Amino acid sequence: MTVLPTGLDTNSPEYAANRAALLEKLTELEAEHAKALAGGGEKYVARHRGRGKLPARERIELLVDPDTPFLELSPLAAWGSDYAVGASLITGIGVVEGVECLITANDPTVRGGASNPWTLKKALRANEIAFANRLPCISLVESGGADLPSQKEIFIPGGALFRDITRLSAAGIPTVAVVFGNSTAGGAYVPGMSDHAVMIRERSKVFLGGPPLVKMATGEESDDESLGGAEMHARTSGLADHFAVDEQDAIRQARRIVARFNWRKAHADPGPAEPPKYDEDELLGIVPGDLKVPFDPREVIARLVDGSDFDAFKPLYGTSLVTGWARLHGYPVGILANAQGVLFSEESQKAAQFIQLANQRDIPLLFLHNTTGYMVGKEYEQGGIIKHGAMMINAVANSKVPHLSVLMGASYGAGHYGMCGRAYDPRFLFAWPSSKSAVMGPQQLAGVLSVVARASSAAKGLPYDDEADAGLRAMVEQQIEAESLPMFLSGRLYDDGVIDPRDTRTVLGMCLSAIHTAPVEGARGGFGVFRM
């Protein structure tokens, strides 16, 4: 057993300053999460309850097994847009009758649960997670369909939702739809394409066209119940597989459906795991408020992995990247963590070899980001930084073992790609409130624009306006700073959530458990050409 030592001084001024800065960011984060939790606000929640209906989150609470956690995904979707934070949809992973399931629930207190462009992106991301990890899907449906004013952004890509349901079923991944209210127009295909559909007496309304549309199109007089009521679908159309008397009964029946899946995980759950030797609360004081100041990621690893036990790989080579093996909640993981921000040729080659080893051993990889990117300059260009960086990115792109990414600090430039950023399809990607991500840092980007503008003026023989340049740089820095912050990026679904660092071990443990529902198999020689 190789227990990581700690050099973290929790009594130092630096630790206190780091902790205070992160706690301030967590306070801001909690305020934004509260908006998602509030749904449509007190008025609309009260109206919903007044109709005898449960809020979406209470439906989920009844669905999942008692005293089991629910890992909510993308809670800040639509942050910074014209739509409500959360995008009128709740998604996450919960345990139902002992089975880990991907659960989605429309929030009818937000514009009747209507889908906007961010709702669609959030739902599609949930489907990706379900498919990659072979998680059965349960949809708690109550939606008026598409938000019509934004239909141009929803209609064409929105067809992928129904495609996904059928592909999940074809892959042998069960799908269940529980209809609590309206499921109209395109939304009618959610229960229609799911393996199992549960409907509620005098509540569920499932039809392609409601009475007004039918009247306009055919002249036929009809009402909700005869056209798409639960009893009609249970007795006449056959669309309803299960007929419930109320919401609680519908959820009970959904749980019984899952209990009869005869579902088995590809890998057995590991036994009890030893907790880290160090207090997870200390994670709050590790990342500096100024991301230009480096920190030792081993202090983070020591507070995440089982028993703080970590076997380093090539510890004396490419020291700006820490690599090694550990267990997290009993699951084996290979870890890559930035130590000094910049990636050089040595780090790139080290990473590529380590990723290949993980694929040989069928071990998932955890990437802990704090990088400004790959090194630039004449010496490094001549030394092959491009081909070595490409080697690392090649290895990440063609690796077949599951990847998990956590943005702790900076995640800039091609370093974001090499550390398995969103475009490289990590199974899950989370950010700490201390993180930032962009093509480069705000000051660097503003400086590059300034140099280019100055050179352009000189080439034309024109005087350069230094005052205007200072104003431009300040404006660009402010813009890039705002656009690199985690809430901005999370609002655009560039991560699966911004998390409290103290929750990281629990979140990663839940993700690893979900990942092991599906087979974990590495690439066997399936990498592209490595330039040597």
Short names for language-model regions:
Residues M1-M532:
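Ligand-binding clefts of soluble mixed alpha/beta catalytic domains
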